[in-house]
Amino acid sequence: MINDLWYKNAVVYCLSVETFMDANGDGVGDFQGLQRRLDYLAGLGVNAIWLMPFQASPGVDDGYDVSDYYNIDPRYGTLGDFVEFTHSAKQRGIRVLIDLVVNHTSDQHPWFKQACADKNSRYRDWYVWSEKKPENADEGMVFPGVQKTTWTRDEKSGEYYFHRFFKFQPDLNTGNPHVQAEILKIMGFWIQLGVSGFRMDAVPFVIAEKGADVKESKPQFDLLRSFREFLQWRKGDSIILAEANVVPKENLQYFGDDGDRMQMMFNFHVNQALFYALASADTRPLAKAMNETRERPQTGQWGIFLRNHDELDLGRLTEKQRQAVFSAFGPDKDMQLYDRGIRRRLAPMLGGDTRRLKLAYSLMYSLPGTPVLRYGDEIGMGDDLALEERNCARTPMQWSTEPHGGFTKAEKPVLPVIEGGPYGFEHVNVAAQRRDAESMLNWTERMIRMRKEAPEIGWGSFSVLDCGDTGVLAMRYDWRNNAVVIIHNLHDKPVDISFDPGVGESGRVLIDIADGSDSSADEKGRHNMVIEPFGYRWYRAGGLDYLLKRSDI
């Protein structure tokens, strides 16, 4: 059972094959290059790798426009290379999750081409059509300001097809049983090749009712259960990590009341509140967001993240909160995207302040759920705002001071490596940070190890402690008769705090598992301490014999 729930206390590392490591020198990352860097990832301490899209694609939307679900982009290698990679990852105790993009295909997919060429094609009903342009065609765009409509006329058939995303990404008719069966077939194919699960893209759109006549789309939650049942049958410990940016009251519908749908979901609600907390030094909305997303099945888990490959979506904050985050982290219009988010990486958003960067990641590792780290974040990589839209934060990994950061020997990489300035590969790279005991990379390795040694965070229940300052977040996790207490000061000044851990006699001594600064309670059982600007503490309640006190249930 514990093995089936491996994701509860894991650390996930997200990367793009295209920009991670180029082995054959053509300027594009590939699976052979990724395989050669597995020892690096194993040393970092991650349990799972989440791969962004790598299947065959015209590449108009960074692989999210798939043209063949059963093959990989030839630039990245062959299916044989992929199998060798998954096998090598397994040997190092690393699982592989892959993006599953089944809300839509590329308009170059053979299914869509046949659907356009012949109205009687078996693939016609695999997509969503309308004889005339629906009245609401200018509503519901995913990319406002860039996207003009969700319905586009197909010149061959004269009818309009639906696309929630760009016009070159026609939506699959996921209400069609034949499409549903094909999705299961796709999942089964990649499970057979060694993957341990999927990060399912755009889940609310996948399960939505689609069609010109649909006025109020009702989610088809039974689809999620069928996906889960299929995976349980094929490989019991495989999972789906759902991208579902929904309001908290809908979360249980995605997890399933009995935990029979999605095993994991990204916690967008907490993510947005976390950035507001970092911008304002007010932790109350963050504590509120954690409480609002507290309820989940015992087998369910949140994916906790800071930045991902998309823009930082602030759409669920209030207007005042959103403007505060924009002002702090993305004041220029060039830093913003789609009227709702920021397209920067975290390090430049925080002004390169290592104290704030470590504070932010310490928060990520300590929030309820499983941390998801993005490639390059472990060394504090920057962004290139000269690149279009989201590409500014998708630049190649910076390995060394060699040309193009050691990513490729080609004259021209697939995307330019950041060069010059404080975030250039000359200054920010893996090789240099390996030699520096106080580097971001070595700190991240220590933090991942510490997080994995605190299963209370992944498995236990949490309480927010009153420490007398709204700019300080103090939390306690309880699991199997063990407790950890974690404190973060979001102020840019030192703060005096006082708190009761709330665990009785075992809370009189707090052992610092981060730097050894233990704390003893006063005669009233309260701990009094000064937390430095942007400081944090990780404590374990009781003595270091906690493992002997841990109960079996």
What positions do the PLM features span?
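Active-site and adjacent substrate-binding regions of carbohydrate-active enzymes
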Residues: M1-I553
